[in-house]
């Protein structure tokens, strides 16, 4: 090793040979410290770039330690000692100077002197005469240069705020306090600058944060902040000005994107027999099928293995089928259920669609960081682009974001805060959240941009339910409540009524009393009616298209169901109460009027089919251990099922009519889930629907004929085949009759003018014969004979 160093730097070797070991260890000579790193850089970098090494073979070192490989293009390994000194002692500038000096010495040095020093012929490490050093500093000193100061350091922590009020010296201090209060919540402000002109501020300011991340946070959250009616802040990074100034003045025409034809995504609505579709997951989730609902037997449309890893979900209008995968969500649609879109979200577990089917919300507990929120992501379904990410609190309940009926707004509730966002910007409405101390729950109206929320009691302040109009944030109704334990918000499907179920503990009593506060939303000043019940409430449900609601109350085995009607005069009338019901859930038909009272799971699947027009029980049945009940979108059929997810045996789904008549029993191995495909809202007006109901008798004959055909034992294909055969026979018969009539004259000539086509043409040739049958009559007496 020592010989190799002497060959490369003979002067350094001579200087190190004279001092004693203590001096060499304590304070090396300057020449040695500079020369050795320089030689390292030249040998390791320049020779490698120069290509082939010295001409002719090279002799190995005499002592055997510092062997140099004579292979062309190869460089000797640097000594470990010098490597340590290069990394730990020599600065970048000294290393470059030493490399230059070593290169010049190698090029102009005396090769004979090197041979004498080494005592043998050693390889030459000098560069060729035409060698050009093209190794950049970034390649040689990347680890050192990465820490050098950058020009942008400090600048990318500066933001520019426009639309700031222009004030004089007397109000400048007050303005600074307001600005500091708004922008200091994003991070520590280290410097500010308020440009002035003619004794007044110019309307824009500069703020510097301690960190670029704080500046970026301020831009994201403060841009568009409304200070007052005349001033709305526009916030940008200072570095953005350079970016916008370097934009080319020449406009580049964007490439035209080819239109991707997805086909008719709502083809199933044009089905001739107006049948509905539903999805089925079975074999413990390994297989997924889509069926047409047919009275006789379900008709399979599509079946795939491992289509989803957990479960599936239809979009609100039935356009898309969502499947779950470890890496994200996929949407399918069209006649062949091709993939329409996919969204990458690792470990996704829950999803939610906006009512307009424009946006998709996904949740994953795996991906979330403080700087880049990924727990909840909102996607644009049409483009597949991520719109915004959000953090998720551990105590939140799904759906965390609740959508308005038209998809224009969505909101979330956190501690003492209600945040309302607007689309498509995904930003806060008016750039700020609502501060509502103690807010417990909220819900959107299905019929308008009205939000309802409730706040519990706080010392002497009563609990209250508030109705707020958006986007104006006007409170249209406030209802104060006392002695409140809990509240639940129940909207009627059209938004005509809001029921607030209030559990109270009246003073002087130990039990819990339930009040149903009914808000009549379509009337002036939103009047409220109250129904009080002292029994335990099991379930509550509004009629979807009507003004009735049902309540399950009591305790097993004395459970009752009560049906109420909200009249136009404001009175709430009890229509009917059924005692001794085995039910724990209420399922209204989507069209109203009919309801199924089901005792699911622990109540062994007891079913009661009720017509609320006259409050009669049409049928009582049972589907043992039923876990789910699903109405079809039209309200004609209802499915009860036993899911493998809740019960491991007798997994199947049964199809019933709305009257409670059982049509099918479909058993599937490890059946898991059945979901009807939703239908979009009808395009018909209420007047058109009324006219159709009036003319329904005209179509009844057609419907009855179709019903008879569908109830026939022969399949549809067999009936069609028979109809085709009958039509072919009629055509053949007509053709044969025409040929028969054409040949009549020929027959008359052959038979001497006698028309044998008629039976009475020749009466003389008739022969009459009488045939007698002998009949035996036997009388058998019935009963006892005395």
Curated annotation (Swiss-Prot):
It is found in: Cytoplasm; Cytoplasm, Stress granule. This is Eukaryotic translation initiation factor 3 subunit B. RNA-binding component of the eukaryotic translation initiation factor 3 (eIF-3) complex, which is required for several steps in the initiation of protein synthesis. The eIF-3 complex associates with the 40S ribosome and facilitates the recruitment of eIF-1, eIF-1A, eIF-2:GTP:methionyl-tRNAi and eIF-5 to form the 43S pre-initiation complex (43S PIC). The eIF-3 complex stimulates mRNA recruitment to the 43S PIC and scanning of the mRNA for AUG recognition. Keywords: Acetylation, Cytoplasm, Initiation factor, Phosphoprotein, Protein biosynthesis, Repeat, RNA-binding, WD repeat. Component of the eukaryotic translation initiation factor 3 (eIF-3) complex, which is composed of 13 subunits: EIF3A, EIF3B, EIF3C, EIF3D, EIF3E, EIF3F, EIF3G, EIF3H, EIF3I, EIF3J, EIF3K, EIF3L and EIF3M. The eIF-3 complex appears to include 3 stable modules: module A is composed of EIF3A, EIF3B, EIF3G and EIF3I; module B is composed of EIF3F, EIF3H, and EIF3M; and module C is composed of EIF3C, EIF3D, EIF3E, EIF3K and EIF3L. EIF3C of module C binds EIF3B of module A and EIF3H of module B, thereby linking the three modules. EIF3J is a labile subunit that binds to the eIF-3 complex via EIF3B. It comes from Bos taurus. Residues 157-240 form the RRM domain. InterPro entries: EIF3B, eIF3B_RRM, Nucleotide-bd_a/b_plait_sf, RBD_domain_sf, RRM_dom, TIF_beta_prop-like, WD40/YVTN_repeat-like_dom_sf.
